[in-house]
Amino acid sequence: LRLVGSEMCIRDRVKKENDLNQGKWIGIGGKFEDGESPEDCILRETWEETGLTLTDYRYRGLVTFVSDEAPTEYMHLFTATGWTGTPHPCDEGELAWIKKAELRGLPMWEGDKIFLRLLEENVPFFSLKLQYQGDRLDRAVLNGRRIV
């Protein structure tokens, strides 16, 4: 996920069939490869999905996704304000620079709206647990305290 001034670079998952995120706007990122740290992973995934090399980025939080339909997943959140390179098309979805004020109007997971707000408010490093029943956010716990 990249926050840059008043805009954010995210992608619409329209290209992958049978994708859990189909039709939703999500941040840039992916799965760890063997031996990678969170920093290694975000640098590689950003380059693979955008063609950009991050030069100034910050580790912001950890999100735990719990679902009744899938195994638990963990997402490491980063924001970036510096990069080099020229964006290229992504085979996983359409990349776009979206104004922060327009983000909440896009189709996205309800829990994503929570961590986007935390990032925009510059909350210090946080742990967020999001629990879903199907596509519905059932519970959100921020730093051990229930918020939804």
Predicted regions and their residues:
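Beta-strand scaffold of nucleotide-dependent catalytic cores
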Residues: 11-15
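Phosphate-binding core of ATP-grasp and ATP-grasp-like enzymes
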Residues: 18
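Catalytic phosphate/metal-binding cores of nucleic-acid and nucleotide-processing enzymes, i.e., regions
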Residues: 61
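Substrate-binding/active-site groove segments that recognize
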Residues: 28
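A positional/architectural concept
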Residues: 22-25
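Acidic/histidine-enriched, glycine/proline-rich intrinsically disordered or flexible terminal extensions
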Residues: 125-148
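Unchanged
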Residues: 32-55, 65-119, 140-148
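Single conserved hydrophobic/aromatic residue that forms the stacking wall/gate
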Residues: 1-10
